[in-house]
Amino acid sequence: VKSRLLLAALLAALCVPALAAPAAKPKAKATAARNWLTTAGRTAEGAIVIGNPAAKVKLVEYLSMTCSHCAQLSAEALPPLQRDYIARGLVSLEVRHAVRDGYDFAASLLLRCEPPARYLESIEALFATQPQWMQKGAGAAAVPGFDSKSSDEKMLAVARASGFDSFFARRGMSPQAFAACMADEKAQQQLAQMAGNSWERDAIPGTPLILINGKRQEGVHDWADLEPLIRAALK
């Protein structure tokens, strides 16, 4: 019930963007011959995890796709994090979508419909153009008849106005897959529950928020803040 209420609230805010069988035990040490960026899984709550399941460092990021600080951290940290740590099996990354508004919900829903191999790359690409698609999406409310649409219709209109249909099409998502993803009630409920857990159960103070091996890391704003924490956890 809670997730349904949260979902309804998020969809109602579409035009109010936020202010800024067990496998064999894997070896703990990195395997040079394997690129762990191609390994992905999901937690019981549906969060996507990229990397070696037995990585010594388990990194969790709570993020919002409409958070400018998240976009900044992504631009600085994701390339070296993937290349130097996740690919080598040293670190795994779990992404928890702490959705804040309707734009965020539509973007996060579509990202989670991507094949895991494209997931982090698509997050990077969306963050890189965040100001542009947020501005375009705001125009959806000016279209006559918008207010009379259902919540799902509003979300689809905003997603298209934001250019998400063409963005994901360029990355291999067919129009049919796009429409199916946007209409997937189970995926909507799971995402709404993840957002509710982030803000209510986990009581995060804001985004981005980083956990390293289950411990909150305060004051992580860029790669210069994050990398020393990862290195320390690897010792």
Which residue stretches match the model-derived regions?
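Extracytoplasmic thiol/disulfide redox context detector
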Residues: 2-8, 14-105, 192-195, 235
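Intrinsically disordered, low-complexity regions enriched in Pro/Ser/Thr
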Residues: 8-9, 171
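Hydrophobic alpha-helical transmembrane segments of integral membrane proteins
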Residues: 13-14, 204
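Cysteine-centric redox/oxidoreductase cores and disulfide-bonded domains
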Residues: 99-206, 211-215, 220-224, 229-234
